[in-house]
Amino acid sequence: TENYRMGQRAYSLTPKCYGLMEYDRESVLRAAQAGNLNTLSMAESGILAVQGEPLNLTGKNVTIGFIDTGIRYQEDVLRDLAGRSRIVGIWDQTIQTGTPPEGFEYGSEYTNEMINEALVSDNPLGIVPSTDANGHGSVMASLAAGSPIENGSFTGAAPDCQIAVVKL
């Protein structure tokens, strides 16, 4: 209908995140067709452009918080280049057997130090038992804050930020 087409045209005129970006659409599509994660939406929104020169906006000195289904802290996409976790802490409100954060009487807090200890352990869940069975929180954190994957097929919007998690 005319209203649908009008709405579609209006959206196409809306400026993206960083002005009207130009990107090599063909290279993005080739990467997607090669089995890499489709980064077209990140390119179209301007995220890839602001990550590069001259802005270099990658989330450095920023902490992003996620209140969600938890996080799969063992994933490589949530680590820095040295393999350490970029998660500053997890407050798992579903686990009542650990120490709650200061000022609270429920849930269990897992610090960055505890998470890093778990990452080098043979039994990580014995140290930090927090999980994300649903996966939603992990996906959201990866999209917003994921580190670049080694083969270049993925990077999050703010790959240099720190991550704070509250699991409900």
What are these regions (language model features)?
Residues 1-63, 70-86:
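Autoinhibitory propeptides
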Residues 52-168:
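Subtilisin-like serine protease catalytic core
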